[in-house]
């Protein structure tokens, strides 16, 4: 979790105990290029801390992909619709290259932070 922890601690004061709690609640995952981490009109129930690689978030509007953001090493991706409004995602999130990420249940993320 080197890149994730470095990004977090560069932005916020994070205790060693908090980092350990996070480590205890994540699962290491490997995703191939073009993998759909999050799909529109579905619940994901998870957030992903990106250790290595890059993702793209986008909407599908009249058959056209509209990119809304990119996330890279040290970043986090999740469905804001799901986390904040408890509704299915309106966005897709796909990997732009092979990605190593740490997956955490949204319920655990809320509980921890």
Where are these regions (language model features)?
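Short beta-strand segments in beta-sandwich/barrel cores
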Residues: 27, 36, 54-59, 76, ...
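Cyclic nucleotide-binding regulatory module and flanking cytosolic helices
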Residues: 1-28, 82
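Short phosphate-coordinating micro-motif centered on Lys-Gly-acidic
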Residues: 37-42
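Compact nucleic-acid interaction/catalytic patches
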Residues: 59, 64-67
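Glycine- and acidic-residue-biased ligand/ion/polar-headgroup-sensing regions
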Residues: 34, 45-56, 73-74
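Cyclic-nucleotide recognition modules
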Residues: 66-113
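Short coil/loop residues immediately preceding or within conserved phosphate-binding loops
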Residues: 26, 44, 65, 88
């Amino acid at each position: 979790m080197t890149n994730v922890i470095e990004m977090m601690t560069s932005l916020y004061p994070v205790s060693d105990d908090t980092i350990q709690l996070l480590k205890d609640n994540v699962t290491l995952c490997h995703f191939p290029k073009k993998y759909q981490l999050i799909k529109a009109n579905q619940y994901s129930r998870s957030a992903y801390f990106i250790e290595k690689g890059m993702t793209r978030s986008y909407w599908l509007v009249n058959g056209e992909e509209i990119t809304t953001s990119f996330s890279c090493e040290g970043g986090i991706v999740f469905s804001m619709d799901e986390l904040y409004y408890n509704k299915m995602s309106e966005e897709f999130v796909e990997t732009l290259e092979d990605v190593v990420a740490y997956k955490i249940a949204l319920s655990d993320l809320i509980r921890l932070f």
